[in-house]
Amino acid sequence: MNNKKSQYPQMTYKQAVEHCRYWADQIRADGLDLLTTDYGAAIGVSDQLAYPLEMQTWINSQEYPLLYKVCVYAVTVDNDHTDRASWEKLLELIDKL
């Protein structure tokens, strides 16, 4: 286990879902047109969504497949803010939580 991950505060499932929904609201408020073209705006949103999820040691594809997919897409948009399809898929997945 990554020592950095093990020392990061762990959320409950409910807290993780609330975290995702909060950032989905922020994404929608900012708009995908802005987030796919303005690196500064995008990094502020995507990093704050993705990083805490990445640090959750309990999120895995077997026990929490939907939340795991949200994590994958959160990291995807954090790495490539111009990928509009991934932003859209991220929002779609969060809506299913």
Where are these regions (language model features)?
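Short, low-complexity interaction segments enriched in Ser/Thr/Pro/Gly
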Residues: 1-2, 11, 66, 86, ...
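A composition/secondary-structure signal for short, hydrophobic, low-basic-content segments
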Residues: 3-6, 11, 22, 44, ...
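N-terminal cationic leader/targeting segments used for protein routing and processing
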Residues: 3-6, 15, 61, 70, ...
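Short terminal alpha-helical segments
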Residues: 5-39
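Small-residue hotspots
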Residues: 17, 24, 50, 70, ...
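Generic structural signal for hydrophobic core residues of well-folded globular domains
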Residues: 23, 74, 78, 94-97
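Acidic, low-complexity, intrinsically disordered interaction modules
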Residues: 32-85
